[in-house]
């Protein structure tokens, strides 16, 4: 348990930040699922538009510090490779 006032405040700040980051991570997962559903359904146009939205959301989360930049880049790269392979 936090003893000092500053430690108590840090506990409150961490709880707020955790909630915000959890929401951001959930939002990213939702956008990624939309891309994956479009890929499995075979709808290439929907997959491309969903990929653009998912990439934007992923990079926003990277900028906010929710994901490491390499993690974001890896996820975008793998998703775009899967969308690209639909046309081949």
Swiss-Prot record:
It holds the Pfam family Ribosomal_S20p. It comes from the Bacteria. One of its GO terms (cellular component) is cytosol. GO terms for molecular function: small ribosomal subunit rRNA binding; structural constituent of ribosome. InterPro entries: Ribosomal_bS20, Ribosomal_bS20_sf. The keyword Nucleotide-binding does not apply. GO terms for biological process: translation. Keywords: Ribonucleoprotein, Ribosomal protein, RNA-binding, rRNA-binding. Belongs to the bacterial ribosomal protein bS20 family. Binds directly to 16S ribosomal RNA. This is Small ribosomal subunit protein bS20. It comes from Maricaulis maris (strain MCS10). The lineage of its organism: Bacteria, Pseudomonadati, Pseudomonadota, Alphaproteobacteria, Maricaulales. The gene is rpsT.
